UniProtKB/Swiss-Prot annotation:
<dbReference type="GO" id="GO:0003735">
    <property type="term" value="F:structural constituent of ribosome"/>
</dbReference>
<protein>
    <recommendedName>
        <fullName>Small ribosomal subunit protein uS2</fullName>
    </recommendedName>
</protein>
<dbReference type="GO" id="GO:0006412">
    <property type="term" value="P:translation"/>
</dbReference>
<dbReference type="InterPro" id="IPR005706">
    <property type="entry name" value="Ribosomal_uS2_bac/mit/plastid"/>
</dbReference>
<dbReference type="GO" id="GO:0022627">
    <property type="term" value="C:cytosolic small ribosomal subunit"/>
</dbReference>
<comment type="similarity">
    <text>Belongs to the universal ribosomal protein uS2 family.</text>
</comment>
<dbReference type="InterPro" id="IPR018130">
    <property type="entry name" value="Ribosomal_uS2_CS"/>
</dbReference>
<keyword id="KW-0689">Ribosomal protein</keyword>
<dbReference type="InterPro" id="IPR001865">
    <property type="entry name" value="Ribosomal_uS2"/>
</dbReference>
<dbReference type="InterPro" id="IPR023591">
    <property type="entry name" value="Ribosomal_uS2_flav_dom_sf"/>
</dbReference>
<keyword id="KW-0687">Ribonucleoprotein</keyword>
<dbReference type="Pfam" id="PF00318">
    <property type="entry name" value="Ribosomal_S2"/>
</dbReference>
């Protein structure tokens, strides 16, 4: 199946109601159907291919991609696909400063690791019941917000965002730090300042699944390429 047909099947072409449009998206809109803007997939296809290629190249060069999707219908998909390809993710709430104040976030990640170790080795059980419950609650709270980035080990090389409106703080932080931004931009969004714009439906579960699967596959393929290069290097050393 061609990429265009896959997008049509996933409903990528459905934008928002005309009343909610952002005029800056005009060049990516094909027309209106029953009061809803229809996105021009002839524009989306090459832009999406560019974005997927960029993600693959970044990973092949040893880079990390942070996937961000905190809206209800994106949460489970973002988490599952990010885990499948071994990349960090934020799927519940974007903490202000998650990138721009990463030093502080790193301290919270360290705290989470310490508490998890205490739970695993039984140290938590030696505390009073009140202290143990407080620490368990802290673990749950930190895990929910930071669980997806606890293995990130530093700032990402790029972020992939499902909804550029919803995740505007994440985008602003990435831009401040010169981190590349890939984003799904619907007809009600502002495409300005986004490095890799993907005009498309950012609400439908089928569309979100389509994007995330393609990105995760690109990461996995790039990791395979990376491993192949490493294997050749090892063979050369052994020879």
């Amino acid at each position: 199946m061609s990429l265009m047909k896959e997008m049509l099947s996933a409903g990528v072409h459905f934008g928002h109601k005309k009343a909610f449009w952002n005029p800056q998206m005009k060049e990516y809109i094909f027309g209106i159907n029953h009061g809803v803007h229809i996105i021009n997939l002839e524009k989306t296809v090459p832009l999406f291919q560019d974005a997927v290629n960029f993600v693959g190249k970044t990973v092949a060069n040893g880079g990390k991609i942070l996937f961000v999707g905190t809206k209800r219908q994106a949460q489970d998909i973002v988490e599952a696909e990010a885990k499948r390809c071994g990349m960090p993710f934020v799927s519940h709430r974007w903490l202000g400063g998650m990138l721009t104040n990463y030093k502080t976030v790193r301290q919270s990640i360290k705290r989470l690791a310490q508490l998890e170790k205490m739970r695993e080795d039984g140290t938590l059980e030696s505390l009073t019941k009140k202290e143990m419950l407080q620490n368990i609650r802290t673990i749950e709270k930190l895990e929910k917000v930071l669980g997806g980035i606890k293995e990130m080990g530093g700032l990402p090389d790029a972020i992939v965002v499902i909804d550029s409106n919803k995740e505007h703080i994440a985008i602003q932080e990435a831009q401040k730090l010169g981190i590349k931004v890939v984003a799904i931009v619907d007809t009600n969004s502002n495409p300005e300042g986004i490095d890799y714009i993907i005009p498309g439906n950012d609400d439908a579960v089928k569309s979100i699944s389509f994007y995330m699967k393609k990105f995760a596959d690109a990461v996995i393929d790039a990791q395979g390429l990376d491993r192949a290069v490493e294997a050749k290097a090892d063979e050369a050393v052994q020879a």
